[in-house]
Regions:
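A residue-level structural signature of the nucleotidyltransferase/glycosyltransferase Rossmann-like core
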Residues: 10-11, 26, 109
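Conserved N-terminal beta-strand and adjoining loop/helix that marks the start
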Residues: 1-11, 30-33
């Protein structure tokens, strides 16, 4: 996941659409899954371009968000969630990008301030994602699926 900053106090926000395969929706930053044979950084660059039209560079790794599913996933979990599993999201920031923004099947995108994002319908636990990205003293958020994440 990547927070892209425009240098004018705004970040690129995606209005993630609810899908049958993934119930995680709302305002979030672009990002996705790592494909086989792909590094984490390469996956962020690819996912951001696929979802927003922007090509990012000079990525700064801020920390991680991890959560565990104990037993069966909650009914509203993403279809790819497996029983007794752990998921890790790598959180990046950048101010370096090229291209023009465009929406994708994942959702529409627009520039907004963090205050505007926070006052909107954010995806679950996005506040904890933002804290890890912005607070140099916090580098991880952890929790069990369906619960609020703890900052570490």
């Amino acid at each position: 996941m990547c927070m892209i900053e425009d240098g004018h106090g705004r970040v690129l926000v995606q209005h993630r659409r609810p899908k049958a395969s993934n119930s995680w929706h709302g305002l979030a930053f672009p990002g996705g899954h790592v494909e086989n044979g792909e590094s984490v950084t390469a996956s962020v660059i690819r996912e951001v371009e696929e979802e927003t039209g922007l090509v990012v560079s000079n990525l700064h790794l801020c920390g991680i968000v991890e959560w565990e599913i104990v037993g069966e996933p909650p009914a509203d979990s993403a279809a790819e969630c497996r029983p007794d599993s752990k998921y890790i999201v790598f959180l990046f920031r950048t101010t370096s990008y090229s291209g023009e923004i465009r929406s994708s099947s994942e959702g529409s995108v627009e520039w907004m301030t963090l205050d505007e994002m926070r006052s909107g319908d954010m995806a679950p636990n996005m506040e904890e994602h933002i804290r890890v990205m912005l607070d140099g003293d916090v580098n991880e958020a952890y929790g069990l699926s369906g619960q609020t994440l703890r900052l570490l």
